[in-house]
């Protein structure tokens, strides 16, 4: 009988599948469920409250079995964590196509999703859980680091030294926050209701210390701030209680955000319920639990707004807590901005986003060599060099060794081709898997996060992630995914992902060049279409073809030369 057991990706240079593309998908699926990586591997939950890698253990076994026998001209189809077919395609086609959690508009809500999930018909794939490219907390670390660096540049003279940040949530995503703040030389208090999450972040060196109480946490924070010493402090408790308490205490907080699992009310602990009773309470009365969770979120957000009124820099970190608080009746829920319009969108306009890779060999030396390759490729990028150096020194690998760094249009393809050459020459022991978060410049429609406050009002236009998925299929990605609801919950986002394998072959090189050009290119054209000047400049400088812009240029040229004048070649 298929059921829970420890899962770990194979290491080494010998594939058990019929090709490295299939082997890569197999190893990354298994890596997502490695106990070092997944939050609740026995339940197939990788991160984000309920984000799963497979619908059930029987489906997991079927995917493993199928990937091992999949031919070089075949494609496995995965419907919400279950393999539903194998089709003959061709060598340029993806080996796996994945669709997770997608529901028709009027049915796209948590209640209907849970009804269908209970029937065994779907699963919640989050972003990289169901698309098999989660690499542990490092996966969000640089984005979090860059966000806090942007906060520092905006308000604190380029450093967080001498500041205290308050946040909550130390799960797979939120667990990046303490290290991201201390990398920017700041002090941070991190609240979580799960003692295991706090202990795990300390074990993985993302969190420095655990406070005995809220008063103790504040004492540690102020002492470190006064010495301008970086320090991250975990404190056990319910954010809906502790954040308002800190506000009432007049705590000297400079920055406030949140990464609890607010996107799913059943994953947010209401006040008055003990953490140990949370799962039973949610299962027994999901509607009542949801109401109580939203009421608690409203108090949490009200306190965040209170800190903003007191002068703190406050932002939503993309977990939909503002929307949930608004549903509970709090009318100032959107008084503070989301992190993308506040800090990240200029990077998106340049086609920049979270480029990540993993060493299928399992050898950390392969990542060290790729780190050096990145530094050699982009010697002028000082912030990238600082990140790679810090990551090499401070990031704990979870599962297969991996790295993330933000690269833009015209950079990702260079990195991918270099990695492929290194595999071909034998410098790397085994192929490299290259992917990204779905949180990227041109792959998401999410009005509460990535596409919040778009210049042209196109926040909810969902054509872009669909086009992104299709162009990655057409370009030769190894597997492509199209999900709904990741990050912010059902009905609030549609997003796509791609993974491409550098196996050292000339064919892989051709695929890499296309995928890693076209994928970030979608970010450039999406922001050109929305009217962003930065994106317009990038498109012009780097020869990104945008037909509507070409039409405008042609029209301007005609006007300049006289539209009625005969021109050479017109046949007149």
From Swiss-Prot:
Name the UniProt key words of this record, in alphabetical order. Answer: Cytoplasm, Histidine metabolism, Lyase, NAD
Please give the Pfam families that the UniProt record associates with this protein: Urocanase, Urocanase_C, Urocanase_N
- Provide any one GO MF term from the record: urocanate hydratase activity
Q: Which cofactor does it need?
A: NAD(+)
Q: Which GO biological process annotations does it have?
A: L-histidine catabolic process; L-histidine catabolic process to glutamate and formamide; L-histidine catabolic process to glutamate and formate
Catalytic activity reads: 4-imidazolone-5-propanoate = trans-urocanate + H2O
Q: In which pathway does it act?
A: Amino-acid degradation; L-histidine degradation into L-glutamate; N-formimidoyl-L-glutamate from L-histidine: step 2/3
Record's compositionally biased regions (Basic and acidic residues): 550-559
E.C. number: 4.2.1.49
The keyword ATP-binding appears for this protein: no
What does the record give as the active site?
Answer: 405
Q: What does UniProt give as GO cellular component?
A: cytoplasm
So where does NAD(+) get bound?
A: 48-49, 126, 172-174, 192, 238-239, 259-263, 268-269, 317, 487
Q: How the cofactor binds, per note?
A: Binds 1 NAD(+) per subunit.
**InterPro entries (UniProt xref):** Urocanase (IPR055351), Urocanase-like (IPR023637), Urocanase_C (IPR035401), Urocanase_central_sf (IPR038364), Urocanase_CS (IPR023636), Urocanase_N (IPR035400), Urocanase_Rossmann-like (IPR035085), Urocanase_sf (IPR036190)
Where does this protein chiefly localize?
Answer: cytoplasm
Its localization reads:
Cytoplasm
Annotated region (Disordered) at 550-572
Sequence similarity: Belongs to the urocanase family.
Name of the featured protein: Urocanate hydratase
* Native organism: Streptomyces coelicolor (strain ATCC BAA-471 / A3(2) / M145)
The organism that produces this protein has a lineage beginning with: Bacteria, Bacillati, Actinomycetota, Actinomycetes, Kitasatosporales
């Amino acid at each position: 009988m298929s059921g829970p057991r420890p899962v770990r990706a194979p290491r080494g240079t010998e594939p058990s599948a019929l090709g490295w593309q299939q082997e890569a998908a197999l190893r990354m699926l298994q890596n997502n469920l490695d106990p070092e990586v997944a939050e609740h591997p026995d339940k197939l939950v990788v991160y984000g409250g309920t984000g799963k890698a497979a619908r059930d253990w029987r489906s997991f076994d079927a995917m493993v079995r199928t990937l091992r026998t999949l031919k070089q001209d075949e494609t496995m189809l995965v419907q919400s964590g279950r393999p539903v077919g194998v089709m003959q395609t061709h060598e340029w086609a993806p080996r796996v196509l994945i669709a997770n959690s997608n529901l028709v508009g009027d049915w796209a809500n948590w209640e209907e999703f849970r009804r269908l999930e209970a029937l065994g018909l779907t699963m919640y794939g989050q972003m990289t859980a169901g698309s098999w490219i989660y690499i542990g907390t490092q996966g969000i670390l640089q984005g979090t680091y860059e966000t806090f660096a942007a906060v520092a540049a905006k308000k604190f003279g380029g450093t967080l030294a001498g500041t205290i940040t308050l946040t909550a949530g130390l799960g797979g995503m939120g667990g990046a926050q303490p290290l991201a703040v201390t990398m920017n030389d700041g002090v941070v208090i991190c609240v979580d209701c799960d003692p295991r999450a706090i202990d795990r972040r300390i074990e993985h060196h993302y969190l420095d210390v655990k406070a005995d109480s809220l008063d103790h946490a504040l004492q540690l924070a102020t002492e470190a701030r006064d010495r301008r010493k970086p320090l991250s402090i975990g404190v056990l408790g319910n954010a809906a209680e502790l954040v308002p308490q800190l506000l009432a205490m007049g705590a000297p907080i400079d920055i406030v955000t949140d990464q609890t699992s607010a996107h799913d009310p059943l994953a947010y602990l209401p006040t008055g319920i003990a953490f140990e009773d949370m799962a039973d309470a949610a299962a027994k009365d999901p509607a009542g639990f949801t109401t109580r969770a939203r009421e608690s979120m409203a108090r949490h957000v009200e306190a965040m707004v209170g800190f903003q009124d007191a002068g703190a820099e406050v932002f939503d970190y993309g977990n939909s807590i503002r929307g949930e608080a608004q549903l509970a009746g709090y009318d100032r829920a959107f008084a503070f901005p989301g992190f993308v319009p506040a800090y990240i969108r200029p990077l998106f306009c340049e086609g920049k986003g979270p480029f990540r890779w993993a060493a299928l060999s399992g050898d950390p030396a392969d990542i060290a060599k790729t780190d050096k390759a990145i530094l050699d490729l982009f010697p002028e990028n000082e912030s990238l060099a600082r990140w790679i150096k810090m990551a090499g020194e401070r990031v704990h690998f979870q599962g297969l060794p991996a790295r993330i760094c933000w690269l833009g249009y015209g950079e990702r393809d260079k990195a991918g081709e270099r990695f492929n050459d290194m595999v071909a020459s034998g410098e790397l022991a085994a192929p490299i898997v290259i992917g990204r978060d779905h949180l990227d410049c041109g792959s998401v429609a999410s009005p509460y996060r990535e596409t919040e406050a778009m210049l042209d009002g196109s926040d909810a236009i969902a054509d872009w992630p669909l086009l992104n998925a299709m162009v990655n299929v057409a370009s030769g990605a190894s597997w492509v995914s199209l999900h709904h609801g990741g990050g912010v919950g059902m009905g609030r986002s549609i997003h796509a992902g791609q993974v491409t394998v550098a196996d050292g072959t000339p064919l892989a090189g051709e695929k890499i060049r296309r995928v890693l050009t076209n994928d970030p290119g979608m970010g450039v054209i999406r922001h050109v279409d929305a009217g962003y000047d930065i994106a317009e400049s990038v498109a012009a400088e780097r020869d990104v073809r945008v037909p509507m812009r070409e039409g405008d240029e042609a029209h301007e040229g005609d006007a300049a030369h006289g539209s009625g004048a005969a021109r050479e070649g017109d046949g007149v």
